[in-house]
């Protein structure tokens, strides 16, 4: 569940639209699927039209341009947690949910709050997500 004050979620380096499409289907939040590749955006636009989903948008752009603007971001494979911390501007309205490898991060705890979440996808596989907030 996303915090009530989130109006727009940007799925950076979306690829096939995961997790952005799922967020768009299950919420009324505006979801921007951002990817630099024209073919991906074309296919995602077709999928959005088939789903008749009016709160999800496919945008062809460099995801790093959006990181610099701040906001609420999700990413499955686009960027590592370490690169997120190095790329984020210190905007207190920035939150980033990113899949990770579960390793400890080297970051300035005065600037960032990082919460590591682990979850099982079956009895043997664990996945990791880092929730990174600018303080």
List each language-model region with its residue ranges.
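N-terminal glycine-rich "phosphate-gripper" loop used for MgATP/nucleotide binding
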Residues: 13-16, 77-79
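Conserved class I S-adenosyl-L-methionine
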Residues: 5-15
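Glycine-rich helix-loop-beta junction characteristic of Rossmann-like nucleotide cofactor-binding loops
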Residues: 1-5, 65-67
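Conserved SAM-binding loop of SAM-dependent methyltransferases across substrates and taxa
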Residues: 16-28
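S-adenosylmethionine
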Residues: 22, 32, 36-135
């Amino acid at each position: 569940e996303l915090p009530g004050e989130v109006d727009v979620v940007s799925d950076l380096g979306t690829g096939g639209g995961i997790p952005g499409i799922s967020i768009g289907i299950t919420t009324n939040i505006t979801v921007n699927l951002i990817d630099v590749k024209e073919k991906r955006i074309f296919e995602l636009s077709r999928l959005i039209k088939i789903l008749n989903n009016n709160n999800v948008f496919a945008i062809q752009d460099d995801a790093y341009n959006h990181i610099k603007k701040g906001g609420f971001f999700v990413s499955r494979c686009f960027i590592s947690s370490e690169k997120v911390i190095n790329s984020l501007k210190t905007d207190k309205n920035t939150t980033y949910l990113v899949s990770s490898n579960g390793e400890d991060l080297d970051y300035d705890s005065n600037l960032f709050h990082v919460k590591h979440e682990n979850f099982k996808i079956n009895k043997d596989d664990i996945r990791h997500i880092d929730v990174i907030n600018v303080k």
